[in-house]
Every structure is written in C-alpha cells, then in structure tokens.
Amino acid sequence: MIENQSDNIDNKEKDVSNQDNAPEDISSEQNSTNENDELTSQKKEAINTEELKNTISNNDARLKQLEKEHETLKNQYVRISADFDNFRKRQSRDQDDLKIQIVSKTLTAILPIVDNFERARQQLQPESEEAQALHRSYQGLYKQLVEVLKQQGVSPMRVVGQQFDPNLHEAVLREPSEESDEDFIIEELQRGYHLEGKVLRHALVKVSMGPGKQNSQQEVEKDTVEEDVNSEVNTSEDV
C-alpha cells in the first residue's frame, strides 16, 4: 500500500516536470520556425530583387532598341518625304516643259505669218483710199495675232545695239562699222522671240566687225597687189 502511494507520487512529479519542460520545447520550436520564415522571406526578397534587376535591364535594352528603330524609321520617312517632294517638283517641271514644247511648235508655225505682216507693213505704201482701207484691215489682223502671242507668253527681242549672244542671236552677216564696236548688232534681219523667258526663235542679225576693219582689209589687199607687182618686176629683170 505504501509502495503504491510512493509510485503515484513519483509519477506526479514526472508529470509536473514534463509540464515544466513543455513551454521551453514549444518556445524553441517557435523560434526555429520564425528563423526559417525569416530565411525564406530573405531568399524570396533576394530572388525578387534579382528578377527586378533583370526586368529593368531587359526593359532598358528594349527601350534602346525601340529608340534605334524609331530613329531609323524617322530617317526613312525624311528620305521618302524628300524623294516624293523632288518627284513632285520634277513632275511639275516636266509637265511645264512638255506644255512649252507643244505651245512652241504651234507658235513657231505662226511666226512666219507675223513676219509677212511686218514686211507688208514696211513695204506697202497704199495711196488710194481703197488700198488704205485694205491695209488697215491687214493691220487689224496683225494686231490680233500679236495680242494672241502676248497672251501665250510670247515677247519679241530687242536686239539692235546689243552685244551679240549666240544663245539668243544668229549672225547672218558681218560688216565693218564706224558707229558700233565689234560684236555688236547693227541690224535686225528677222525678229527673235521669247516664250516664258526661253528662246522661241533666235533673231537673225547683222553684226559689226568694228571700225577700221574695212581699211585693214583694203591695206592687206593693197600689200598683196604690190607684192605681186614686185614679183613680176623681179622676174622680168631676171629674164
């Protein structure tokens, strides 16, 4: 009986001892769990930081690539825009040139008619009233032709007294002149015309050789004659 009671007391003491040690075990387990959680959290943070750095680096690289592509496309747009603008200007210029070529052919065919009217006006001297009336009628037609030419952008050249220019004039005759310097136009033989600032027809002109040219030519001929005479005289003496 006494032994049983002693055993019960020992068991109770063990239970009390176990109960006293239990909180320490629980606290140790909690600390271990907290440490593991902290390590896990640190690992996750490290992983997230690395991923963020990689993401930022990739985004920077992508941004640079997009900026490069944007610059390339911008340059292409500028070139295409410039090419199109040049094409538009060239197309407009070609159309204007074609228009002038077509108009030039038509107007060039009309110019001889205008020349005939001008010759008639200079040469005809109507005496009777009937002839004068006919002359006025012709002059009316001539003025209408000139007006049509003006409306089409045709303008006559003024060449007398101007220096000879092969781009504008065609020299038909050259002769000495005491009044004009060399290579200056002294007479218009056929009128020249401009069309929109371009030459529609060259003017046929007489050009001055300058003063003294005729005398120089005569002196050359005189010297040649004298040489021939002297040569004949020398030949006679030798005989």
Swiss-Prot record:
User: What is the stated purpose of this protein?
Assistant: Participates actively in the response to hyperosmotic and heat shock by preventing the aggregation of stress-denatured proteins, in association with DnaK and GrpE. It is the nucleotide exchange factor for DnaK and may function as a thermosensor. Unfolded proteins bind initially to DnaJ; upon interaction with the DnaJ-bound protein, DnaK hydrolyzes its bound ATP, resulting in the formation of a stable complex. GrpE releases ADP from DnaK; ATP binding to DnaK triggers the release of the substrate protein, thus completing the reaction cycle.
What are the Basic and acidic residues biased-composition ranges?
40-53
Give me the ranges of the annotated region Disordered.
Answer: 1-56, 208-239
What is the organism of origin for this protein?
Prochlorococcus marinus (strain MIT 9215)
- What's an example GO BP annotation here? protein folding
| Keyword list, A-Z | Chaperone, Cytoplasm, Stress response
Q: Which PROSITE patterns match?
A: GRPE (PS01071)
What are its GO cellular component terms? Answer: cytoplasm
Regarding protein family, the annotation reads: Belongs to the GrpE family.
Q: Which gene encodes it?
A: grpE
Q: Which CDD domains match?
A: GrpE (cd00446)
One term of GO molecular function? adenyl-nucleotide exchange factor activity
**What Pfam families has UniProt attached to this entry?**
GrpE
Describe, as the record does, how this protein assembles with itself and its partners.
Answer: Homodimer.
Q: What is this protein called?
A: Protein GrpE
Quote the Gene3D superfamilies the UniProt record gives: 3.90.20.20, Head domain of nucleotide exchange factor GrpE
